């Protein structure tokens, strides 16, 4: 074996040995972050997801952006009647039960939410930082709704 062949074989063997994976174990789970559902139904959904929809110019009349699953892959929402609320809590739990459109919207929005709202896609994308259009500016009052939800 020539020196060049030996060197190539050694480098290849070292490279192969350095490529390893870490086995997370049998009980690995991704932490499930829970955000206040009542706050979502009574504040976030009506003030952000419904009112802001596509922002100035209403870019899509085809069920308004996120309410059209064909147009959005990240946070597809389902239209439904506004959840009845009083004192910050839904008054009719049947409107938000398992399998309901409202519950699906909560799950979709929670996936793009973070305790540090300034890193959450639900804040970044509509403020134009990671989205093809600006839906609302960073100074919009609805940002406070997102911030408050992150704390709940």
Walk through the language-model features, giving the residues of each.
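Sec-dependent bacterial lipoprotein signal peptides
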Residues: 1-18
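Aromatic- and Gly/Pro-enriched helix-to-coil junctions and flexible linker segments
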Residues: 19-152
């Amino acid at each position: 074996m020539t020196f060049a062949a030996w060197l190539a074989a050694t480098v290849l063997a070292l490279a192969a040995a350095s490529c390893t994976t870490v086995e997370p174990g049998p009980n690995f789970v991704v932490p499930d972050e829970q955000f206040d559902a009542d706050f979502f139904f009574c504040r976030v959904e009506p003030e952000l997801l419904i009112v802001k929809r596509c922002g100035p110019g209403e870019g899509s009349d085809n069920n308004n952006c996120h309410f059209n699953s064909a147009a959005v892959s990240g946070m597809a929402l389902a239209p439904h009647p506004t959840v009845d609320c009083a004192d910050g809590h839904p008054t009719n739990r049947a409107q938000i039960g398992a399998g309901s459109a409202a519950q699906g919207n909560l799950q979709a929005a929670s996936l793009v939410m973070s305790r540090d709202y300034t890193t959450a896609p639900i804040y970044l994308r509509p403020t134009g930082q990671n989205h093809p259009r600006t839906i609302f500016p960073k100074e919009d009052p609805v940002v406070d709704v997102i911030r408050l939800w992150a704390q709940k």
